């Protein structure tokens, strides 16, 4: 109420200043104006009252923000809006460095550099190449080297005292450091910030599935695995542990969760989100934000962190499948699905959001006032701050060509609603933004709004009172309790897709383990694991078990033969493979009872993970085909971040397990599951395609699946899937019965209570993800064939029955109509759980005037 009263007062004052003359000559006319203005103000505040602030306002905290803001100079305000990379404050030296020019050539080609650039680089001296590439986490050296990074205190002084920089990010060389190193670096940064500015720095790291950049911390399965668990409690616990270990490292801000809907399997960041569905992403992001930030986003304690939900929004749908390329998304799809998880994040209280690097329908998101300010800040009353991704304001002129130069790009982005620029290597942002303010091209009110949002986040994190955390009180860093949580998440995330009676695999059998993913931690961890691309995981994960090591522990080393047949070229791009040695694997098969083929992908992320062919590599498929000729039963283990096509080898396997990217304990989890010491309970978080030109999602339009039409023309549109979204097997069986809905007829304001009985009819204990779908049978625009509306996960002992109940607001069955408005139409809907269905009737059409319902 206080907030609304303040708004009312401010609106009245502003309108009176604008419309009422300073000298009143006609009292009657003036009073009439005032009455009209009061009505207008009441209407304005009534509209605002319909949308509560995403995070409830704390009056005392807001007063502190305003007091700090009032003391700041323009230079200090602009400095708060800049985020620099830590690398610019130090220097990397490489001991025993001798450059391998073929590696340099390979690295540059992998990152898309032109032939001329590559030729010019390899002609430089060793030291010149090291100066240009040494800070990056790429291997360009002959033999063993040691990379040493040292903070330059004088440079740090200059950047904070002169340029007033308010945020720093990243790890030196994008490589993991120790807890002690993080403590030392960030404490020094905070000392300088408090000394020169009286305002703490907000330090950010990509701790995407655990403490990516802190050696010795806990890494969890990647987000795509958490999506496969359909268990929000695991998402919450993983985030809670990551927050604790981040704060132990003195890092208060993480660039996570990721809720870009992974609806295109070609995209190289599929595995960084929770999958293709909006509801799964929405429920998971709400759980993770609570785990990261705690119960009160206004007062985040020293064991929790601020979140930066990313990448707002539509980032996961590039038209070409290539990272950071344009997306073309219908208004309906954009509002109904791609926006929904970010709305959930805002309402869950995420402190910040990171913005989509690309464009939607020709408009760069960094340049869109509609998306940044209207949809997010105004419509949702979200008061966090928006940060760019890596140098993305620059891309408005260098790549997107919507600005003539950097200054113009800054003007466009800041006026659109960007609050902080991640401009990693330059302070030019400060110079140019100050010029824009002085020229009147960016208003002081826009600057104050951005800085107010940044200060608010710093106060909410408690950084003004205690800029540093870590040391005493963080003894649980990397403890067994956290390891068990990671193992449980891995066990619940690995999906059994096929089992022709071969699993569980009895002990005492001789096993051939083959394939490029058989003995590598890098593949189990994926990108954002100790380094940006995850390419150095082997050096920092010696205490964890590869698939080979885990199977040796489970079945006995004497029963496991390792002959990979195909291996990755670790000096090349993620997809590069060495010359195959399939004949060796085939020869080894003669000595065993069963073959486990661990195949899939090496680690990657972002642009280096782009692909030109969704099929699994020819070498790996040939390996399976040749092994199948031996007649020995094959178990396929897919270790991949996106669904690589395997339609030609799946029929050759007796069982298929997709472990996705399961993290530190993924190998141990697999061994437990294969042996039957744990039970499979995961379900596919995305649709697994069978064919290269049939990349459907589960909620495809009904017109995408049509048979023969009357007459001569055969429409024959078919959805061809390898495995559908939500599919996954178990060692036990579940029976659904008694699907009930408390209302057969409903209106938009109703809540439908949907219940179903689930019984474990098998001989093993198991967990089951229960999924509630709806279908709109007839609509004014082509309806989806079905939509997931809710889910939960339950544990059942053999013979046990539980009743699962969902509360489904009827308005959730609405869609965005052709005019861009939410609409619930009169007509019939089908609710479905398992194979059971119930028909319900909407008795009255409703169209909403608000952008969100």
Identify the function of each model-found stretch.
Residues 1-53:
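Bacterial Sec-dependent N-terminal signal peptides
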Residues 46-814, 825-833, 837:
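Glycoside hydrolase catalytic-domain context in secreted enzymes
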Residues 817-819:
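Flexible, membrane-facing loop/turn or short amphipathic-helix motifs
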Residues 838-853:
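Short beta-strand elements
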